[in-house]
Amino acid sequence: MDSDYSFSLTTFSPSGKLVQIEHALQAAASGGSAIGIKAKNGVVLITEKKLHSLVDVTSVQKISMITENIGLVYAGMGPDSRVLIKKARKESEKYYKQYKEKIPVLQLVRELASIMQEFTQSGGVRPFGVSLLVAGFDEKGPHLYQVDPSGSYFAWKATAIGKNMVSSKTFLEKRYSDDLEIEDAIQTALITIKEGFETQLTEFNMELAIIGKNQEFKILTPAQIKDYLLNL
């Protein structure tokens, strides 16, 4: 059985799997839903924030700014995401000090993927139990990437991670258009995440962020999110 090989990070099971990576992928897949949509003029990130009723929702943040033109959202284990966010910011600072310009989105994605892949084959560590959606805008335009615990990364027009990723991707396939503007992408993201929501969608149980050509990466306030919800 594959489970007999889960004791080792670097031992393949008879079916050709690295079981610890499978566990990490499952941890990411069981996390809160997160969706990314690339529009003609920017990128939208949205995620649910499902917390215990006694938790102060303002103390939990799932979407993070890395640089002025790059941000990310995670699905999976929060503590693991904090490590990767710290490393992403450090790599961005190092790039700026060396080249005196902002790190390209793909360059940062490759750095993150390399770090995550290294944790699938090194002794004394385990894979990161998170998947990331990285959104950014650089001289080549808007970008949306997904990075998985295995170190794999993909460019997407629209995608989802977390517990409702299959149904969300199916929904996005029906609604996505290459002609989407950023405002349309926000509405599409809200409708998509609402489809998988078990309770009423409010400005307090979700996060929403945008990045555009002349717009720094911005995490919207609850009041701004409420305005969009009223127009659904």
From Swiss-Prot:
CDD domains: proteasome_alpha_type_2 (cd03750). The keyword Cytoplasm applies. It is found in: Cytoplasm; Nucleus. SUPFAM superfamilies: N-terminal nucleophile aminohydrolases (Ntn hydrolases). One of its GO terms (cellular component) is proteasome core complex, alpha-subunit complex. One of its GO terms (biological process) is proteasome-mediated ubiquitin-dependent protein catabolic process. The keyword Lipid metabolism does not apply. Gene3D superfamilies: Glutamine Phosphoribosylpyrophosphate, subunit 1, domain 1. InterPro entries: Ntn_hydrolases_N, Proteasome_alpha, Proteasome_alpha-type, Proteasome_asu_N, Proteasome_sua/b. PANTHER family: PROTEASOME SUBUNIT ALPHA/BETA. The proteasome is a multicatalytic proteinase complex which is characterized by its ability to cleave peptides with Arg, Phe, Tyr, Leu, and Glu adjacent to the leaving group at neutral or slightly basic pH. The proteasome has an ATP-dependent proteolytic activity. NCBIfam families: PRK03996.1. The 26S proteasome consists of a 20S proteasome core and two 19S regulatory subunits. The 20S proteasome core is composed of 28 subunits that are arranged in four stacked rings, resulting in a barrel-shaped structure. The two end rings are each formed by seven alpha subunits, and the two central rings are each formed by seven beta subunits. The catalytic chamber with the active sites is on the inside of the barrel. This is Proteasome subunit alpha type-2. It comes from Dictyostelium discoideum (Social amoeba).
